[in-house]
């Protein structure tokens, strides 16, 4: 996994052989990791964090090379910021690994237990998923975050970093593997794909001959769409975060203003940022104008329906496309709706099943919204930007999942496990 061995392109046969070998090693490592006691995993993660700190000069040197290449390719400033590492950011990466080590062990928990009339004692026990493939773009810190979460849950990780961050990711992955090996755990439990060749992504999506159990994409819409379309293994992901704030007729105006400002503007570029504001017509006369004014005064562009345009000349007309747009910027779409039913219909028509919020003092209305909106995270009287594994107390997350199978919402260490049934008998046979 040496940085010096990274190649921009390799022959198709070479990539195929490389990926098969990575998959084989990951599967073997996953079998060992599944049996590692909690204390040993935690010690290994702390050793990995220490190795990252010790390797900081090497990591920063690799990152400088990545940044120089990215600037030469005229990549956007936002991409450069996500790619850039500093001594402080490297320390934050190491601290995040230590925080994951401090989480409760998700493996070996008894999830259920019962006894059958014939005397069979049955228990459901949490177990690792196996091998987790993570495909991500420009953030080098995902290497450590995703790797540590997978390892904490007793899994092996196969990591495919974006081409722009490959040197940085390789240096971080090598440090983590060194930390594992120092504690007697398999270094192959965290493997970075050491090539920029896109055929490697295709091999991962095909499952590496049955060696990958689940794929997690971290990146832009085009990456996630490709993974969801082409993967032959389960995917934990969300395509978009078209998140809504619905201000109900019985919403406290001061609360609604604070929640909306935070939901939209705390960080506009994250998947939990609100992209659409819905205002109940019953309170629009008192609530709509101040809500819109707050956004505009904070530098947020507002695209609204006719009623929203009427309250402020700075509002531009919303189109049908606006209701379906994840802006990831200081832009929001605003619509006045005819009550709770219309709000739920709008969210179900245009939403992405990520995170949606209602602001109201009416508990019955809140319960209906929470029950009927089919999103991974539904919120009452709080910001949509709490859609985060850390805020949920998960310590960290590998992503947000909006599917209906297995993981949904923030994917932390618990969601990176499955379960098995243990059946204890005393000689029973089935009649």
From Swiss-Prot:
One of its GO terms (molecular function) is glutamate-5-semialdehyde dehydrogenase activity. This is Gamma-glutamyl phosphate reductase. It is an enzyme of class 1 (oxidoreductase). The keyword Cytoplasm applies. The gene is proA. InterPro entries: Ald_DH/histidinol_DH, Ald_DH_C, Ald_DH_N, Aldehyde_DH_dom, Glu-5-SA_DH, GPR_dom. It comes from Methylobacterium sp. (strain 4-46). Its main location: cytoplasm. It catalyses: L-glutamate 5-semialdehyde + phosphate + NADP(+) = L-glutamyl 5-phosphate + NADPH + H(+).
């Amino acid at each position: 996994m040496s940085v010096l061995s990274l190649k921009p392109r390799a022959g198709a046969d070479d990539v195929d052989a490389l990926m098969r070998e990575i998959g084989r090693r990951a599967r073997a490592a996953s079998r060992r990791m599944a049996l590692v006691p909690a204390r040993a995993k935690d010690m290994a993660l702390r050793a990995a964090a220490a190795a990252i700190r010790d390797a900081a000069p090497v990591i920063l040197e690799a990152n400088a090379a990545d940044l120089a290449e990215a600037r030469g390719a005229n990549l956007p400033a936002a991409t450069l910021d996500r790619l850039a590492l500093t001594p402080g950011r490297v320390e934050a990466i190491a601290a995040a690994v230590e925080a994951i080590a401090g989480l409760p062990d998700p493996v070996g928990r008894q999830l259920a237990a019962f006894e059958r009339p014939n005397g069979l004692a049955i228990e459901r026990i949490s177990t690792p998923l196996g091998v987790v493939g993570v495909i991500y773009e420009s953030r080098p810190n995902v290497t450590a975050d995703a790797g540590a979460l997978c390892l904490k849950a007793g899994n092996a990780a196969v990591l495919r970093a974006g081409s722009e961050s490959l040197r940085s990711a390789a240096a971080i992955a090598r440090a983590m593997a060194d930390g594992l090996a120092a504690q007697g755990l398999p270094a192959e439990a965290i493997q970075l794909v050491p090539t920029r060749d896109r055929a490697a992504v295709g091999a991962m999506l095909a499952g590496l001959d049955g060696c990958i159990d689940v794929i997690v994409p971290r990146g832009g819409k085009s990456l996630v769409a490709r993974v969801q379309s082409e993967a032959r293994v389960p995917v934990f992901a969300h395509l978009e975060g078209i998140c809504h704030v619905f201000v109900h007729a019985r919403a406290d105006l001061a609360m609604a203003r604070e929640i909306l400002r935070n939901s939209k503007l705390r960080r506009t570029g994250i998947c939990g940022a609100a992209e659409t504001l819905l205002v109940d017509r019953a309170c629009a006369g008192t609530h709509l104008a101040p809500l819109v004014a707050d956004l505009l005064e904070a530098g947020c562009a507002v695209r609204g329906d006719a009623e929203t345009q009427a309250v402020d000349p700075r509002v531009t007309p919303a189109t049908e496309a606006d209701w379906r747009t994840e802006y990831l910027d200081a832009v929001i779409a605003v619509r006045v709706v005819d009550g709770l039913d219309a709000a739920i219909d709008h969210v179900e028509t245009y939403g992405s099943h990520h995170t949606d919020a209602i602001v109201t003092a009416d508990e019955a209305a809140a319960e209906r919204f929470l029950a009927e909106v089919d999103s991974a995270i539904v919120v009452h009287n709080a910001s949509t930007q709490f859609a985060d594994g850390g805020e949920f107390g998960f310590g960290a997350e590998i992503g947000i999942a909006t599917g209906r199978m297995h993981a949904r919402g923030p994917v932390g260490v618990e969601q990176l496990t499955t379960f098995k049934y243990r059946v204890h008998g005393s000689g029973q046979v089935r009649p």
